[in-house]
Amino acid sequence: MTDRDKAEIFIDEPRRRTPVAGRYDVIVCGGGPAGTAAAVRAAENGASVLLLERQGSLGGTWTGSLMTWLMDVENKSGLLDRLTDGICSLGSLYCRQHGDYSFCPEDMKCVMEQMAVEAGVSLLYHTMLAGVITEVPQGGGVPAVKGVITESKSRRQAFLAPVIVDATGDGDAAAMAGCSFFMGEEGTGRMQPMSMIALVCGLSVRDVRPFCLNYESCPGEAQRHFQELFASCGIRLSYSMPVLTHLKGDLFSVSLNHEYQVPCDDARQITDAVIRARAEVLGALHKLAAADKRWESAIIAHTADAIGVREGRRIRGNYTVTREDLISGRTFEDGICDVTFNVDIHVSGKTGSGSWDDGGVCVKPYQIPLRALIAADVRGLVLAGRLISGDFYAHASYRTGGNILKIGEAAGVLAAAAARTGVAPDEVPFDVVREVLGSGIGT
């Protein structure tokens, strides 16, 4: 490659007029667990809501990335109860250790979609966020959101709303709007690995029961047995504690892959990680089928449409949840989610020992305040999901499914209240949010 090839080359695009395709009270960017919860709650509280999703279904990490188990679900009533009831009615909800749940991703897609439609949410699939429209007040000050720009089969369009919820997972909307953010561990920059999960069918539950998290008698037992099985067949994995979960009938999910130090904002590196990950997953399972009779009838039904991302941008909010908050078990007057999950930091490199560590943090039950869901740098922008304002260690605790759903609910209630009353999210009285979310939050 020549120096000229290495130099940045730009193209000046012609100025263009983008048609406004709709006006709403609230626009939610991202239809994962947090985004769906935010959209449903906002719509149920009187807001007109547009939910934008780049894939063809709701659920995000739970469905597109096949993360088929829910953790930290205690004290998370509300939408979680409605979701689990719906999935249970379809016959795919299994209780795991410590009260966690596993589920069939197709059932989750159906239940979440029906929930959104019944709430009156306007869904727009196969739509990419291309920009966030902001406006600086006359005389200067903090910019305010006015809408978003999208790209899809309908070409380039604009949608307007006074309140936007960023539920993209990686904080794409906030970054486009000019918000400051953090990535990785403070001081080192290390980031948690990505993972490719697969669905496997054709197995006998009786034959693989010792390897299933659903049926283990003590934490970690099934993963150790599963790792020993691969090792006995001469198969070395990038993830030293592989996971097998029974979902429904003869359907299982398998997680055995780690992709290290892949930034969430680099499409080339993510693509390379996906190619490596899929090759490892397919190769390992084919070798296992050839080496162990219990696995010879296994059929790899599906690999995830999107590689699972544990960590991306963490957007600066009006409060940042910290390691110290976890250690002290801090509660807040505006607490919206009770978190009990440990710090779960998957090793950041192949040379690491074990599969995860707690960073030396002993977590006491703590709360996430509503202020951590309000972007500090842009007016009208609400944060939902793992991208809320927190440090590396706090994020490694609250990023699990039960918490993400509850954070999404609070974001939706806040967004609807702000849009209805014509004020900024940080001007909405917390009692308004508390009243809708119900008991069990706050101090």
Spell out what each predicted region is.
Residues 2-7, 15, 23, 41, ...:
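Conserved N-terminal/central alpha/beta ligand/cofactor-binding core
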Residues 2-8, 16-17, 61, 140-142, ...:
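Flavin (FAD/FMN)-binding glycine-rich loop and adjacent Rossmann-like elements that form
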Residues 20-32:
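Beta1/beta-strand and adjacent pyrophosphate-binding region of the FAD-binding site
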Residues 27-29, 38, 43:
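Membrane-embedded transmembrane-helix bundle of lipid-linked glycan/lipid transferases
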Residues 35:
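N-terminal Rossmann-fold NAD(P) dinucleotide-binding loop
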